[in-house]
Regions:
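Active-site nucleophilic cysteine motif
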Residues: 198-202, 228-243
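A mature extracytoplasmic/lumenal domain signature
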Residues: 88-90, 137-139, 152, 254-256, ...
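Hydrophobic/aromatic-rich core segments of domains that either
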Residues: 234-332
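Intrinsically disordered, low-complexity N-terminal segments that are enriched in acidic
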Residues: 3-145
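Alpha-helical and coiled-coil interaction segments, frequently adjacent to or embedded
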Residues: 2-41, 307-358
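Terminal peptide-recognition signature
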Residues: 84, 202, 278
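A short, structured loop/turn motif at beta-sheet edges
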Residues: 77, 125-131, 193, 244-246, ...
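Acidic low-complexity segments
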Residues: 110-115, 119, 126-226
């Protein structure tokens, strides 16, 4: 349909699904009942393929993101010369930061490995001190999907020595030296040499062996593998270990997903959990995204490729390849964690829909 009178056709998509809701039944002894109802949603699909680029952008949203730490220490501890670092949203192919401002204490901005970081400094942090440490950002976020084929990367050059030293090593308790993980890595990739086919084989092999489940803490890949049930962070750990053992450079990406309710504009939305996925590197091309567990929806497959080399508009990329948040002080006790000092608050507000076409 030419909905805007521009002469260009607009593609409309119909989405049909079941929606859970609370039904009020006045005839029941317990009138409030959880049930489902059919819903159909029709909406235009906008997309843009930059010239000579192997990816497409689709519908996006302008979103206000706020992350704040409320100082509320659990212990009576005084800290001197405190430096509190919180990563800021990244500028990527599908994500553009329009504006950033502090919440509470002002910050200075630093660049760490190409990523923006808010740095908060306090001369002293007292046991009874109240306050907020954080930032608020206005960000454009779009859907992204690469349409590469294995044949297009068949002649990819080898990884540089710097990339091998940084992205093929066990730098985060990945248990890469254990028999169970090294054996899984060998079985996952087989004799495949093409980086795209190899990464997809590894992903599908992990999906065959693991099921999704939230755990009280993130275990190392060998523990999660033996258990057979893993959270998104544990999926990422296993995928990182198996990919790196097979010579594929990869790194963790996250940190949150905006609640996928674009009809709820100008309302503060709170994510249920944080979330992580990964990126893998194709020499000569760059970093490609891959979800951790979201495509693991069918027992023993076949698995969709929605998020293999693709992300939806609600994925929020913050501090790519670096730690999201760190704190140091002159006299910080070794056992003291961020959670002992503050409670974090995360909010998203969807402001308006965006068309990726320039």
């Amino acid at each position: 349909l030419d909905s805007k009178g521009t002469g260009e056709p607009t593609c409309y998509v119909s989405y049909a699904y079941e929606e859970p809701y609370i039904r009020d039944d006045p005839n029941a002894s317990d009138p409030f009942q959880l049930t489902f109802r059919d819903r159909t949603f029709i909406h235009p699909l906008y997309f843009h393929q930059p010239q000579d680029q192997p990816y497409t952008l689709s519908n996006g949203y302008l979103i206000e993101i706020s992350y704040a730490e409320e100082l509320l220490p659990l212990e009576s501890v005084s800290l001197d010369n405190v430096e509190w670092r919180i990563a800021l949203p990244s500028d990527t192919l599908r994500q553009k930061v329009r504006h950033v401002e502090p919440i509470g204490i002002p910050f200075t901005e630093e660049i760490q490995d190409g990523q923006r970081v808010a740095v908060f400094k306090l001369d002293k942090l007292q046991p009874d001190q109240a306050g907020l440490i954080g930032w608020k950002a206005t960000v454009e976020m779009y859907g992204l999907k690469y349409f590469l084929t294995p044949a297009e990367v068949e002649d990819a050059p080898p990884l540089s020595p710097d990339f091998q030293a940084k992205y093929l090593v066990d730098d985060d308790e990945l248990a890469m030296e254990t028999d169970i993980i090294s054996g899984a890595a060998a079985e996952a990739a087989g004799r495949e040499t093409n980086v795209l086919r190899k990464m997809l084989r590894i992903r599908n092999y992990v999906y065959d062996q693991l099921s999704y489940g939230i755990q009280p803490k993130i275990d190392t890949p060998d523990v999660a593998w033996e258990r057979g049930v893993a959270s998104c962070g544990e999926y990422v750990g296993v995928l990182l270990a198996l990919a790196r053992l097979n010579g594929i450079a990869c790194r963790t990406i996250g940190r949150y997903k905006c609640p996928a309710t674009p009809e709820q504009k100008n309302l503060p939305l709170e994510p249920d959990f944080n979330h992580v996925w990964l990126e893998f590197f194709v020499p000569g091309l760059g970093w490609l995204p891959m979800e951790s567990n979201v495509d693991d929806v069918i027992d023993q497959g076949p698995y969709p490729k929605r998020f293999f080399m693709g992300l939806s508009w609600y994925h929020t990329e913050i501090g790519k390849g670096i730690s999201f948040e760190k704190m140091k002080a002159d006299n910080k006790p070794e056992h003291l964690s961020l959670g002992d000092l503050a409670i974090n608050h995360v909010r998203f507000t969807i402001l308006e829909e965006l068309n990726p076409t320039p």
